[in-house]
Amino acid sequence: NTMIDAMGVVGEKFKRNEIFVPEMLVAARAMKKGVEILKPHLAGDNTVSAGKLIIGTVAGDIHDIGKNLVAMMLESAGFEVIDLGVDVPVEKFVETVKENPDVKIVCLSALLTTTMPAMKDTVAALAAEDFRSNIKIMVGGAPITQEFADEIGADAYTADAASAAEKAKELAA
């Protein structure tokens, strides 16, 4: 729990512009390594998972720094993260939700304005499969705005990794 609290401090400092993306990445990577080292020793602990979620950069977009940072922050917040990587087709998001009925949130990332339609298509496909009653969709990335998130029917938009972890906790509650 101390490491999770420390990442919370890092997130707050990032929001206040006291640290920047490189420092966040260093802290998140340190947290991830620490968790990897401690995980075998925690096998019997009673830590409750915050839930399972899926994250990926939408089709046509190969950028992953922001997505990776968000994934690390979500893991540090106690989520089990299924990272689909980059350039993820709509069908892969749908298939992964089908294979993981306990998923609570699907996180979609895009850096390029040209791939924003793929984000819209993914939200529509998840709705067409009737998953929307069981999962929440969170979107983010440089060109994404709250207005766009509302327009495509996403449940949440966050502008940075620290906010993403906080919002995911709210959505999973």
Which functions belong to the PLM regions below?
Residues 1-139, 143-151, 155-173:
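Domain-level signal for soluble alpha/beta catalytic cores
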